[in-house]
């Protein structure tokens, strides 16, 4: 596993009063510890975002929902040409700056949204209850991005603001592969996922679907109970 001795975990190194049940050890643990352990396992041990497609030398990578930078940190030894990291949380962004002070990393303190405006949100780590939002199309234009080799997405429901009519030409023709977490935890997200699945997902050449524990669930993607059963899934998409 990659050496993490110099990696700054920010708020995740500070004990939180809030706890969460960890099924692996069958007891409640502090939220910061749970979140840190989950990230280490997902990104540095299981490498969930690179299970099927991998970042290669010279790639242009976009990391949407960069947090404190674990995914980008995990791929830097592959020498990507450029990594664009978006993170809306002000507290996590400060740590992101500490972890990724590299010439081939572009850090952006924004989150993907339906509009270029300030967005109220309950899903930001830290004390923030709003963030600076940007449309995916605006992000592409503002950063002069012509092509993305590897698009990684984990933005707490913001993924549905990426897969929109205005972005589909770019996503289908100017992105090599897309890997991310799709959230179905609320009723509104379940509605959005169904729309995304039935209208946009079928337009891509190759699609693989995994549960959060790595099980292949593509076979049941269009089953009646899929959307009701799952709260979160990992989708791997390729245009190649």
Predicted regions located by residue number:
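Phosphate/nucleotide-binding beta-alpha loop and adjacent structural elements of enzyme active sites
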Residues: 1-240
């Amino acid at each position: 596993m990659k050496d993490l001795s110099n990696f700054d975990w920010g708020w995740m190194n500070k004990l939180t009063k809030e706890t969460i049940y960890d099924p692996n050890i069958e007891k409640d643990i502090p939220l910061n510890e749970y979140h840190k352990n989950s990230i280490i396992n997902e990104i540095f041990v299981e490498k969930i975002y690179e299970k099927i497609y991998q970042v290669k030398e010279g790639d242009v990578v976009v990391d949407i929902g960069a947090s404190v930078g674990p995914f980008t940190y995990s791929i830097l030894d592959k020498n990507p040409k450029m990594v664009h990291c978006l993170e809306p949380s002000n507290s996590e962004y400060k740590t992101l700056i500490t972890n990724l002070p590299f010439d081939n990393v572009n850090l952006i303190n924004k989150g993907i949204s339906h509009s270029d405006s300030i967005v109220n949100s309950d899903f930001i780590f830290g004390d923030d209850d709003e963030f600076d939002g940007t449309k995916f199309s605006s992000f592409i234009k503002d950063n002069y991005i012509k092509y993305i080799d590897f698009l990684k997405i984990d933005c707490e429901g913001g993924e549905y603001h990426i897969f929109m009519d205005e972005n589909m030409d770019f996503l289908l023709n100017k992105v090599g592969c897309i890997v991310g977490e799709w959230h179905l935890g609320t009723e509104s997200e379940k509605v959005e996922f169904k729309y995304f699945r039935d209208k946009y997902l079928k337009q891509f050449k190759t699609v693989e679907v995994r549960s959060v524990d790595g099980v292949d669930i593509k076979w049941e993607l269009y089953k009646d109970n899929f959307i009701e059963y799952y709260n979160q899934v990992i989708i791997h998409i390729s245009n190649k």
